[in-house]
């Protein structure tokens, strides 16, 4: 193999490595940012009934404060459970699948 060929192969490998690295970084950052955006949105949605009540939207919805909070409480609780599952279970375990590697004496 000539030196020029070796250099071109080396440069090609470096290019591939850099593109893979950039793609992984972009994907991880996108997942992290999107998860934080979801969290903020859910927190804002969770506080909406307070603002709605202060702006007397409950009057237009035709129910008192208690029933309004009661109606909104159940879906919010479900969303909170989903959020806990997403942050405590799914995110820490999100890793690319590793190939199975055997010990060298392992019968294949």
Swiss-Prot record:
- Membrane spanning segments where? 25-45
Q: Where in the cell is it found?
A: Membrane
Q: Does the keyword Membrane apply?
A: yes
What does the record say about its membrane topology?
Single-pass membrane protein
Keywords on this record?
A: Membrane, Transmembrane, Transmembrane helix
The miscellaneous remark of the record is: Partially overlaps SPT5 and YML009W-B.
Name of this chain's protein: Putative uncharacterized membrane protein YML009C-A
User: What organism is the protein native to?
Assistant: Saccharomyces cerevisiae (strain ATCC 204508 / S288c) (Baker's yeast)
Species classification: Eukaryota, Fungi, Dikarya, Ascomycota, Saccharomycotina
